[in-house]
């Protein structure tokens, strides 16, 4: 294999502090397919990125272990895969896949938090809330992971939705029932600035009692940058 992640990869998981896996699934995407290729493509693109931060500092402390891809369309199987993946001690990164993979990943994260006696938090960065009960007849659509997270036990006050600019009618009704959900629409962030948003989130979740799961969908970006 080519020099994936430019020398950040560590072959020994016990010596690593960052853990990567992929879930190449796009069965539940409603508008176009191709997201299942992302884990492979992101790894390929990493060949050309030097291991430096934005200030030019070498990321010498990063030791990344790639656990490979978990390939299944069964969320129970994927959840079991994630239970094992989250046993690695360190920082975890999961490449999707359409956003339905969150149904499995946030369940595994929730269960890990319970074992550690921590409060599970979701910061969902997306153009859409993904809080539909069903979408196109499915409860497992890419439009449903936050709805399934609430069903699973996440508290409304520990879910923050960032970058929202598109809603389904049913989601508006859901927000009326779940008023403690924290929502920062795209226009809100534009007005306050990203630094203010980061400050708010750091303040809210700074206590060690929280563990934070960050979910990022590329359509949270302005379409001029990610058409």
Provide a role label for each language-model segment.
Residues 2-227:
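Conserved alpha-helical scaffold segments that buttress catalytic/binding sites
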């Amino acid at each position: 294999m080519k020099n994936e992640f430019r020398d950040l990869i560590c072959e020994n998981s016990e010596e690593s502090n960052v853990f990567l896996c992929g879930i190449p699934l796009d069965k539940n995407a409603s508008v176009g397919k191709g997201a299942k290729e992302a884990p492979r493509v992101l790894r390929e693109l990493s060949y050309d990125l030097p291991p430096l931060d934005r200030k030019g500092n070498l990321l010498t402390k990063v030791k990344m272990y790639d656990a490979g891809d978990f390939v299944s369309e069964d969320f129970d199987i994927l959840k079991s895969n994630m239970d094992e993946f989250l046993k690695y001690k360190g920082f975890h990164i999961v490449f999707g896949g359409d956003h339905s993979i969150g149904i499995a990943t946030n369940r595994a994260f929730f269960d890990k938090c319970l074992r550690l006696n921590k409060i599970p938090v979701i910061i969902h960065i997306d153009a859409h809330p993904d809080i539909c009960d069903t979408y196109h007849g499915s409860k497992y659509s890419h439009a449903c992971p936050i709805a399934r997270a609430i069903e699973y036990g996440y508290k409304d006050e520990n879910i923050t939705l960032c970058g929202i600019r598109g809603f389904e009618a049913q989601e508006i009704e859901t927000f009326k029932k779940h008023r403690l959900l924290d929502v920062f629409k795209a226009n809100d962030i534009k007005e306050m600035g990203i630094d203010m948003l980061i400050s708010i989130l750091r303040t809210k979740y700074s206590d060690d009692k929280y563990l934070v799961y960050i979910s990022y969908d590329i359509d949270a970006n302005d379409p001029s940058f990610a058409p």
